[in-house]
């Protein structure tokens, strides 16, 4: 089960990353002027890059769990750190961008859970959930992909800012 999931997740994550880069290229002129938009576009890229990388590493770790545990731990720390940095800069964003950015806070517990499971693989079993560690991580990765897709959609569908509004945010 886990192998099929991670094969599919890696493919989906990197396909979505490529599609997201098309969106960023399309909105580049508008977003390049806005520091918070550049940060948000990077956040979406990171969702897909981290979930895809974790999925690929899990496929290649074979009978060496230390490999996937290390990769998942590092990815979780990177995701959590990027999220915390994004929240530090939230005060510089216009109100409508802040609403989208606050949705990101939903992912902080997920990134921390990825790190916790990487450190203590029996965590799910310890709390009464009878899943293998990579199956538990698969659920968390699914939720991250779901939130990343929705975050990307919200940014993509956000109407263009008026010139005056984008100048106020700088």
Q: What positions do the PLM features span?
A:
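N-terminal signal-anchor/start-transfer transmembrane helix
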Residues: 11-29
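Membrane-helix exit/interface motif
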Residues: 24-27, 51-65, 84-92
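Hydrophobic alpha-helical transmembrane segments in multi-pass integral membrane proteins
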Residues: 51-60, 111-128
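Non-cytosolic membrane-interface motifs at loop->transmembrane helix junctions
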Residues: 65-73, 98-102, 130-140
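Hydrophobic alpha-helical membrane segments
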Residues: 78-82, 101-122
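Glycine-rich, aromatic-bearing surface loops/beta-hairpins
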Residues: 117-170
């Amino acid at each position: 089960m886990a192998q099929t999931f991670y094969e599919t997740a890696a493919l989906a994550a990197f396909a979505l990353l490529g599609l997201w880069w098309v969106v960023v290229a399309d909105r580049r002129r508008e977003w390049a002027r806005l520091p918070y938009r550049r940060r948000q576009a990077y956040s979406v890229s990171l969702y897909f890059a981290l979930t895809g990388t974790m999925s690929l590493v899990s496929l290649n770790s074979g009978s060496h769990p230390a490999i996937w545990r290390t990769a998942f731990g590092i990815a979780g720390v990177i995701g959590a750190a990027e999220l915390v940095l994004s929240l530090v800069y939230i005060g510089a964003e216009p109100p409508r961008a802040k609403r989208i950015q606050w949705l990101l806070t939903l992912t902080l517990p997920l990134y921390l859970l990825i790190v916790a499971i990487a450190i203590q693989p029996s965590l799910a079993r310890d709390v009464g959930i009878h899943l293998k560690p990579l199956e538990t991580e698969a659920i968390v990765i699914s939720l991250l992909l779901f939130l990343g897709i929705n975050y990307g959609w919200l940014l993509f569908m956000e109407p263009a800012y008026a010139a005056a509004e984008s100048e106020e945010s700088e």
